[in-house]
Amino acid sequence: MASLIYRQLLTNSYSVDLHDEIEQIGSEKTQSVTVNPGPFAQTRYAPVNWGSWEINDSTTVEPVLDGPYQPTTFKPPNDYWLLISSNTNGVVYESTNNNDFWTAVSSVEPHVSQTNRQYILFGENKQFNVENNSDKWKFFETFTGSSQGNFSNRRTLTSSNRLVGMLKYGGRVWTFHGETPRATTDSSNTADLNNISIIIHSEFYIIPRSQESKCNEYINNGLPPIQNTRNVVPLSLSSRSIQYKRAQVNEDITISKTSLWKEMQYNRDIIIRFKFGNSIIKLGGLGYKWSEISYKAANYQYSYSRDGEQVTAHTTCSVNGVNNFSYNGGSLPTDFSISRYEVIKENSYVYIDYWDDSKAFRNMVYVRSLAANLNSVKCTGGSYNFRLPVGKWPIMNGGAVSLHFAGVTLSTQFTDFVSLNSLRFRFSLTVDEPSFSIIRTRTINLYGLPAANPNNGNEYYEMSGRFSLISLVQTNDDYQTPIMNSVTVRQDLERQLNDLREEFNSLSQEIAMSQLIDLALLPLDMFSMFSGIKSTIDLTKSMATSVMKKFRKSKLATSISEMTNSLSDAASSASRSASIRSNLSTISNWTNTSKSVSNVTDSVNDVSTQTSTISKKLRLREMITQTEGLSFDDISAAVLKTKIDMSTQIGKNTLPDIVTEASEKFIPKRSYRVLKDDEVMEINTEGKFFAYKVDTLNEIPFDINKFAELVTDSPVISAIIDFKTLKNLNDNYGITRIEAFNLIKSNPNVLRNFINQNNPIIRNRIEQLILQCKL
């Protein structure tokens, strides 16, 4: 039988492992002798966000605890905590803006009775009444709002660690108060925060506000042990030498320069416009069922003005982490259903690849310090009408998500003619109002953005932002770095495959059915299947190897692998059991039959669901228990062979993909039956089920438990002529009991006779199967 090709591929597809391993070793050996490009990321390698030395980050590396520094007077920067370590009693620090803010912190050692002490604050002698009855040090924060005013105690910090903190942030000055280890922050208002300076009389540390939790930890629990050794020597604050430079939005800055190379920093304001792509596929039949509504990558090209310069940009939008939904209105052919529709939600990501014709993208080969910031954008779904032949149409309507910038890397963006070195912006999602529904169905108030109409009639969505990167380029701007065009090979192959799929699908009308039956009866092997493409044996062997490598990853091969594991488990189980029947039951478990029917109720919908699940496994069951009848795989392989011979575009590179796709997608609607005496039980992949007598073709009640037993013990037969066609044939022409048996068993000779007699019912059924052989 023609399905021998599939069994042969399944058997031999794993024999190419050694060949793959040898080829891989050779490839790795070749690639490992490339020249080390130095400390710069290339566009073909990820990740690209990296900084100095071993820290993989593009941002400036700031230490959590910077110091200690020697006592000094300076104007502290905003958003940085000063952590001051007091080693004696007296004034710890003084701070003022000479306008509306004068404050000082003084320390008092433990166990001090109430007494008056003299302190020099801002050059003047001040007297304070102090007391400390605890075992810890006390720090008194005194304050006045004018240069001539009296100081009053505003806050007190009781600490065993002898640390105080001070921060300029948000128009206020923040300090710690309370008692360690539960000290907290409080603030004082000022109208002139930026001009506040500080006189520090002790060693101190600097901590960024982003690490405030660490500062809180140090205040309450003390510094790390390494900071308390005599080997730590405080430095002058001048050694910190922080230079603050705010880059302009759109400019090119020369960072460094040698004779041949220079580092250029590119800062750019950008406008990103993008749109979602989608694909809506309708099933054949009466027009009430849809196969798939899915997201696809979409390109968009546009122009905009940036600082008086006209910029041409190109974006590619794609999604990742989609959620698969489905809707099933019932098992009748006129019941509306969607096998699968995709929705993006909180667990999804949107990727937008951006390129423009500015200098920043001209030599994007070695890049570092890549950073970006983009606005968020809300995407709201529109309406899609499911145009049914009769009745009111269901409408998928609504849905919304908001895109939030989550990162940027380098990427390669493909167009029809060239590949572009681009920036890939990654966006996380949050669901938003409104929810989406399928009007006139039970699907209501779901959240996310479905793929039916994600653009809602808009030509594009738009967001603005900016990016900055440092690129290593040639000193002479006349030199150009070529883009690695080899990465377009797969893109070219995809275009070839799309053209080939269209050709294959159009050839279905040209297949002669009588020749197809004869071809389906031949034992097609790999040589005879592929010999129509190349005449030499060596090239045919090479193609067969390529097909096996691809076929090994197909759904059919994966299912066979899972079945083999289950049979191994069954064998080990049988060796520990005295009952042969238990062995058979265990072996049948891989079909999920026994498990599926164990809790079935009398509900028709439940039985429909179970039979649909079971029927998808019966292809493998039929394949390992080959009968003399014609199978769906025989027809599938025969159609594949015919189309390969007729095709003008098939080649060595496209053949593996086509054969693998054919094994998975040809004839998706399959019916299988088991036969017991004069009783037939039949199910199909759509969840329909029949039980009937051979003599009369009258239906009888379908017993799913009995069906499960028959599947275990009896051969599974492809229902080439299904029950509906048999019934139609008997009602219009009348068939004998022997003819009915032969058609039920898919006897190829009887099928050929009916076709040669131009029986319209049988011919129509075979034509429908051929039309289902689509990619």
UniProtKB/Swiss-Prot annotation:
Q: Where is this region: Spike body and stalk (antigen domain)?
A: 247-478
Give start-end ranges for motif YGL motif.
Answer: 447-449
> What InterPro entries does its record include?
ConA-like_dom_sf, Rota_A_VP4, Rota_VP4_MID, Rota_VP4_MID_sf, VP4_concanavalin-like, VP4_helical
| Region (Spike foot) location | 509-775
Annotated motif KID motif: location in the chain? 643-645
Q: List the disulfide bonds.
A: 317-379
> Record keywords: Membrane included?
yes
What UniProt keywords are attached to this protein's entry? Capsid protein, Coiled coil, Disulfide bond, Hemagglutinin, Host cell membrane, Host cytoplasm, Host cytoskeleton, Host endoplasmic reticulum, Host membrane, Host-virus interaction, Membrane, Outer capsid protein, Viral attachment to host cell, Viral penetration into host cytoplasm, Viral penetration via permeabilization of host membrane, Virion, Virus entry into host cell
Task: Identify this protein by name.
Answer: Outer capsid protein VP4
Instruction: Please provide, in alphabetical order, the Gene Ontology terms of the cellular component aspect for this entry.
Output: host cell endoplasmic reticulum-Golgi intermediate compartment; host cell plasma membrane; host cell rough endoplasmic reticulum; host cytoskeleton; membrane; viral outer capsid
Q: Where is this region: Hydrophobic?
A: 388-408
Chain coiled-coil ranges: 483-510
